[in-house]
């Protein structure tokens, strides 16, 4: 066997007949498979042991030689070699075909490679190959052109006129002769000459033909090898035949297909020996051709061959294709050993890095480890004995199991695994019951809940795998989300509610204004019921020993609440005392106004002071997230995870103590709701009157009505929130961020508002009732539309989003950080991303965590804030924006010069760790997951505002797909291709609008539809590529008009726009990585003196290499233009044929690769997974695995003896 980790590339090509024979261990002559009585393979049949090897290990067929000692012997009775039965997976056979047969991939694929090479149409080829016409191979004196087709009658006529003086053949034989006569060098010269003169269709065809001829010439494949004389037979274990209960056999379809080929081939041989009439032989040859076609690709031509029950048989091509094919089913995704799955339950007592494993499951998973330990401790005498102990579940087994699982992490995975946080490592602890216990804080990362979700457990076996699981995958290490660098393990639901309740303050709380000496007194008083959690009290500031308090402050009393004192105990000591939910308090110091000088208090003491003070907001989910981020920035990951655990415990404890619950009485209907509705009803009547008088159009009326009712709902919502008691349980749930929001509350107590019809158009009749009052029948009916559409959308969205992620991963999987610095001289100019006046992504967020490309000085003081190639930390980013700088050049994946992947400097910091990114990080996959994972949160809808076609804009998931697939967008904007001034805007025919732009040398007019809004004015100066009407720009056109940089920035902005509008934050760098992959290729315009072909797609680096070579030899360089490919197209155009074939269109990719004799250098991740190597990323990178050890220091003993001498 080959050592998988030790080969560097994989090459594919056409197999010559000699090659096929060299692979084979013998010819299969009979169609028989297994003798049904003896169940032994038939001799010379499809399962023959003499050809493929023995069915039993170390035993020949007749049983003369058994046991290993005869290894390598060939039995003299049955001719079977004594060896392992595994060879039946490796040894191939062959069939000697009685007539040449064409390979369907090369004749039928699009474009037909045979057709291009012979310059014949696929129709003509088909007629020849399937014996409908003759093709002239050697015209002789007939005056016919070579390759002319002759019908049966024409052939007879010529044959009678010129007997034996010309050659015309039928079937693959004729084509084979023509292919053998091709002189590739001669063809190449002719085609190169034709390129100079041809135009239009002829030029395109010439380029296509040139490509095929070049492919054959460079790869060393001979054209005639596209015709088969010998057919290889794959090893029998790969097309098995198994006996079912009841004596019937189940067999792979391939055996049926091979059997048909062998039967027809043998019949043809017999007919040829008998000298049968030509027409019978021809028919048999055609049937043989069809049998081989069905074997290679059933159903590609004509009706597929069917098995029992009219089911089309699965041919060799089908074995590779699609989700169930070899690539995706067996090579890219395998089932794994040492795994289990079960329902998950919450484990609130677990630490951040732990999970609970059911005892039985743990015993089964760690069985071999336990057995080894039992034998080592001499509890069991041997392995067999240990096994039976485990099966009996003896008492001593559990102690050993405890020992074995200590320090041995396991991986937990929840499907669907949308991003890398869908698999994390935990240290197992044994639990009773049969459910896996999961830490409540990691549920957000897994998107898990405990309503019956299941999770899978995997055991990392090797020491290296365990080390990686512990160092890199442990849940306590994965606190930040790779998509935006914010904490992903934020408390949710109960935990949020508990901490919110804990930090709440109330005016009417018991013993407000009591003053205590220290926190211990406070806790005692709370335990004895003297004060409540919400009581506002004073504590001597000096008792806190807080390093951020000034001397002045330590002499005073800190005004706070009992709950906040308890909350602050979980915060690290070096932090300021957190008394209010502000960044100022969190990052710097406790505001001075909370420190009270006891001498200034009046007679009422602190109680009087509190009566005049406003209550402080409690801590909501967002603020808890900020606390976690701040702790993470200042401390180690370990400290952060410990604090998270404490926050979790606090949350659960106090949400239980609070006993918050919801009853009907908590939903208070707004008293003056009817009044608000009446006012808006009057406004609607006014609009209707205006419409009836013809003052406004139907469209304006509809939009006005929708606006009025939206405003009514907003007003009711605003007043509801004002009128609510701050301790109302529903308000607390929504305000804390635990569950629900203001809009849910409005629907419960205010009004439901406007609903959408099934078409997506908003129904102008609002639902004025709330759920508390109850809906009328009509209102209920209207609301069912939305609910139904919501459910249907969710189902579709999940599938769509998953497919988008798959395409994204595929296009970016080979982007890995390959070097420290690529030394580029270009940078990307960044500033705020705005849409009109609305801010989409601020400048400060875009530069933080990136490397600068220029020196930035403070505009006033002229001090240097940052130099080129330095990392922009949050502090520096703040300095830059505070200095009033609004744009700067940064290093970006767009401008990176790294050949494969990106470099550290152009990528910036790794968002998952907050440190600089390391060489070997698979940033492409991370980018794809970061963009794909929130896909399910995006909406599916195209919003219809009043059914006007012009103003429908695609948003959400469809828009993201549109951008990444580089499709023509819906609602396309008109852009100007010249720089100049808008000269005129006028109505054109067919209700269109015409915009005239006058440039320096030319004037152009652009047509826009009558409904589209024009956003330029007459006399306004416009740049190339500027938008004239509202809508989305078509990116491919924009690339040719505005150039590469503008297109990159535009695509980035558009993606950010969609995600940010849905409230999803994704870092720019992920989008940059994806867009860069879409712009990797250029299309050659003129080849110059290089070897490139005009019109072909070439990787940008190959193009620059070819030109560099040309310049070196003082030759003419090639010219090219950048091309924007959609992600599907870009995946299929990658340099690696293994990656492309396992993605989509498997047969097309492999056909093309075989003809070109492509070699795959295994640079990406997929290729290496397919052939079973370690992936070249992370610890699998060659620079990490090829570490050489050198002893530089002398052994200690030697050093000591020398020191004695010198003394």
Swiss-Prot record:
Pfam families: RNA_pol_Rpb1_1, RNA_pol_Rpb1_2, RNA_pol_Rpb1_3, RNA_pol_Rpb1_4, RNA_pol_Rpb1_5. SUPFAM superfamilies: beta and beta-prime subunits of DNA dependent RNA-polymerase (SSF64484). Its EC number is 2.7.7.6. Keywords: DNA-directed RNA polymerase, Magnesium, Metal-binding, Nucleotidyltransferase, Transcription, Transferase, Zinc. Zn(2+) 1 binds at residues 60, 62, 75, 78. Coiled coil: none annotated. Mg(2+) binds at residues 449, 451, 453. GO terms for biological process: DNA-templated transcription. GO terms for molecular function: DNA binding; DNA-directed RNA polymerase activity; magnesium ion binding; zinc ion binding. It is an enzyme of class 2 (transferase). It catalyses: RNA(n) + a ribonucleoside 5'-triphosphate = RNA(n+1) + diphosphate. The RNAP catalytic core consists of 2 alpha, 1 beta, 1 beta' and 1 omega subunit. When a sigma factor is associated with the core the holoenzyme is formed, which can initiate transcription. The sequence of residues 1057-1140 was published in Fig. 2 but not submitted to EMBL. Belongs to the RNA polymerase beta' chain family. DNA-dependent RNA polymerase catalyzes the transcription of DNA into RNA using the four ribonucleoside triphosphates as substrates. This is DNA-directed RNA polymerase subunit beta'. It comes from Staphylococcus aureus (strain NCTC 8325 / PS 47). The lineage of its organism: Bacteria, Bacillati, Bacillota, Bacilli, Bacillales. The gene is rpoC.
């Amino acid at each position: 066997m080959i050592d998988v980790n030790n080969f560097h590339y994989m090459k594919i090509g056409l197999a010559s007949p000699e090659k096929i024979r060299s692979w084979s261990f013998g010819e299969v002559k009979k169609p028989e498979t297994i003798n049904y009585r003896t169940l032994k393979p038939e001799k010379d049949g499809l399962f023959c042991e003499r050809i493929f090897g023995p069915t039993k290990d170390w035993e020949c067929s007749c049983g003369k030689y058994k046991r290993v000692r005869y290894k390598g012997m060939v039995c003299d009775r049955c001719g079977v070699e004594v060896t392992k039965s595994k060879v039946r997976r490796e040894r191939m056979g062959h069939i000697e075909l009685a007539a040449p047969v064409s390979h369907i991939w090369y004749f039928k694929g699009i474009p037909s490679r045979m057709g291009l090479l012979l310059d014949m149409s696929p129709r003509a080829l088909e007629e020849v190959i399937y014996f409908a016409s003759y093709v002239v191979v050697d015209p002789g004196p007939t005056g016919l052109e070579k390759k002319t087709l002759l019908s049966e009658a024409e052939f007879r006529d010529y044959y009678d006129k010129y007997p034996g003086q010309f050659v015309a053949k039928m079937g693959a034989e004729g084509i084979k002769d023509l292919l053998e006569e091709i002189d590739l060098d001669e063809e190449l010269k002719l085609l190169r000459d034709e390129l100079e003169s041809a135009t239009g269709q002829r030029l395109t065809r010439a380029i296509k033909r040139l490509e095929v001829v070049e492919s054959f010439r460079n790869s060393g494949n001979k054209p005639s090898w596209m015709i088969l004389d010998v057919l290889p037979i794959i090893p029998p274990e790969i097309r098995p035949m198994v006996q079912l209960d009841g004596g019937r056999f189940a067999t792979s379809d391939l055996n049926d297909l091979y059997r048909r080929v062998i039967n027809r081939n043998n019949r043809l041989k017999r007919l040829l020996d008998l000298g049968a009439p030509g027409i019978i032989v021809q028919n048999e040859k055609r049937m043989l051709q069809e049998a081989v076609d069905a074997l290679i690709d059933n159903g590609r031509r004509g009706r597929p061959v069917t098995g029992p029950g009219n089911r089309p048989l699965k041919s060799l091509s089908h074995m590779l294709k699609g989700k169930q094919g070899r690539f995706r089913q067996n090579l890219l995704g395998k089932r794994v050993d040492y795994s289990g799955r079960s329902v998950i339950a919450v484990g609130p007592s677990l630490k951040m890095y732990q999970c609970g494993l059911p005892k039985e499951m743990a015993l089964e998973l760690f069985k071999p480890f336990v057995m080894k330990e039992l034998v080592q401790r001499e509890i069991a005498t041997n392995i067999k004995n240990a096994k039976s102990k485990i099966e009996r579940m003896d008492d001593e087994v559990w102690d050993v199991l405890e020992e074995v699982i200590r320090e041995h992490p396991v991986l937990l995975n929840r499907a669907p695994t949308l991003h890398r946080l869908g698999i994390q490592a935990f240290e197992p602890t044994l639990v009773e019951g049969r459910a896996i216990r999961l830490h409540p804080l990691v549920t957000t990362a897994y998107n898990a809940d405990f309503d019956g979700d299941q999770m899978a457990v995997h055991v990392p076996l090797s020491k290296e795998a365990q080390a990686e699981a512990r160092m890199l995958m442990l849940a306590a290490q994965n606190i930040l989300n790779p998509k935006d660098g914010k904490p992903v393990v934020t408390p949710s639901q109960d935990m949020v509610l508990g901490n919110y309740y804990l930090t709440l303050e109330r005016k009417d709380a018991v013993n407000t204004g009591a003053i205590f000496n220290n926190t211990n007194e406070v806790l005692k008083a709370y335990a004895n019921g003297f004060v409540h959690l919400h009581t506002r009290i004073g504590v001597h500031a000096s008792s806190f020993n807080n390093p951020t308090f000034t001397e002045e402050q330590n002499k005073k009393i800190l005004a706070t609440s009992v709950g906040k004192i308890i909350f602050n105990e979980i915060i690290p000591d070096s932090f300021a005392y957190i008394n209010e939910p502000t960044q100022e308090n969190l990052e710097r110091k406790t505001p001075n106004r909370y420190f009270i000088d006891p001498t200034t208090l009046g007679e009422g003491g602190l109680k009087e002071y509190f009566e005049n003070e406003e209550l402080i907001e409690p801590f909501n989910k967002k603020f808890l997230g900020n606390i976690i981020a701040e702790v993470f920035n200042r401390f180690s990951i370990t400290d952060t995870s410990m604090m998270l655990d404490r926050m979790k415990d606090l949350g659960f404890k106090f949400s239980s103590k609070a006993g918050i619950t919801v009853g009907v009485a908590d939903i208070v209907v707004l008293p003056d709701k009817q009044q608000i509705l009446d006012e808006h009803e009057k406004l609607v009547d006014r609009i209707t009157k205006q419409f009836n008088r013809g003052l406004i159009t139907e469209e304006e009326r509809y939009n006005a009505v929708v606006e009025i009712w939206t405003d009514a709902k907003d007003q009711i919502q605003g007043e509801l929130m004002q009128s609510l008691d701050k301790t109302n349980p529903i308000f607390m749930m929504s305000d804390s961020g635990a569950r629900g929001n203001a809009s849910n509350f409005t629907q419960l107590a205010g009004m439901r508002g406007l609903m959408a019809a099934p078409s997506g158009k908003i129904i102008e009749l609002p639902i004025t009732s709330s759920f508390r009052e109850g809906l009328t029948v009509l209102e209920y009916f209207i609301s069912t539309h939305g609910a139904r559409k919501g459910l249907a959308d969710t189902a579709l969205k999940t599938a769509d989003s998953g497919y988008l992620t798959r395409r994204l991963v595929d296009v970016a999987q080979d982007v890995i950080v390959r070097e420290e610095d690529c030394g580029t001289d270009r940078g990307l100019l960044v500033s705020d991303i705005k849409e009109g006046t609305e801010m989409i992504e601020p400048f400060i967020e875009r530069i933080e965590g990136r490397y600068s490309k220029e020196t930035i000085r403070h505009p006033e003081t002229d001090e240097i804030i940052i130099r080129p190639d330095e990392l922009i930390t949050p502090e520096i980013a703040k300095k830059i924006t505070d200095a009033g700088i609004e744009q700067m050049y940064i290093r970006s994946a767009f401008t990176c010069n790294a050949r494969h992947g990106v470099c550290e400097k152009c990528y910036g910091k790794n968002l998952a760790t907050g440190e600089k990114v390391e060489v070997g990080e698979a940033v492409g996959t991370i980018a794809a997951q970061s963009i794909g994972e929130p896909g399910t949160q995006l909406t599916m809808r195209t919003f219809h505002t009043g059914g006007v076609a012009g103003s429908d804009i695609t948003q959400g998931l469809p828009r993201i797909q549109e951008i990444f697939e580089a499709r023509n967008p819906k609602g396309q904007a008109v852009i100007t291709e010249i720089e100049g001034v808008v000269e005129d805007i006028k109505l054109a025919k067919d209700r269109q609008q015409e915009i005239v732009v006058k440039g320096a040398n030319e004037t152009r007019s652009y047509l826009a539809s009558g409904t589209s809004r024009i956003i330029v004015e007459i006399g306004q100066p416009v740049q190339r590529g500027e938008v004239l009407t509202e809508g989305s720009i078509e990116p491919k056109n924009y690339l040719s008009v505005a150039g590469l940089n503008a297109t990159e920035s535009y695509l980035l902005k558009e993606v950010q726009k969609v995600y940010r509008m849905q409230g999803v934050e994704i870092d720019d760098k992920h989008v940059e990585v994806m867009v860069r992959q879409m712009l990797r290729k250029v299309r050659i315009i003129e080849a110059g003196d290089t070897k490139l072909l005009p019109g072909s797609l070439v990787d940008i680096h190959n193009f620059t290499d070819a030109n560099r070579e040309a310049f070196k030899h003082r030759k003419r360089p090639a010219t090219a233009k950048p091309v924007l490919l959609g992600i599907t197209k870009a995946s299929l155009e990658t340099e690696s044929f293994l990656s492309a074939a396992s993605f989509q269109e498997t047969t097309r990719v492999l056909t093309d690769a075989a003809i070109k004799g492509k070699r795959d250098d295994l640079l990406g991740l997929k290729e290496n997974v397919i052939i079973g190597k370690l992936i070249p990323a992370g610890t699998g990178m060659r620079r990490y695995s090829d570490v050489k050890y050198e002893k530089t220091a002398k052994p200690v003993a030697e050093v000591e003896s020398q020191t004695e001498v010198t003394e």
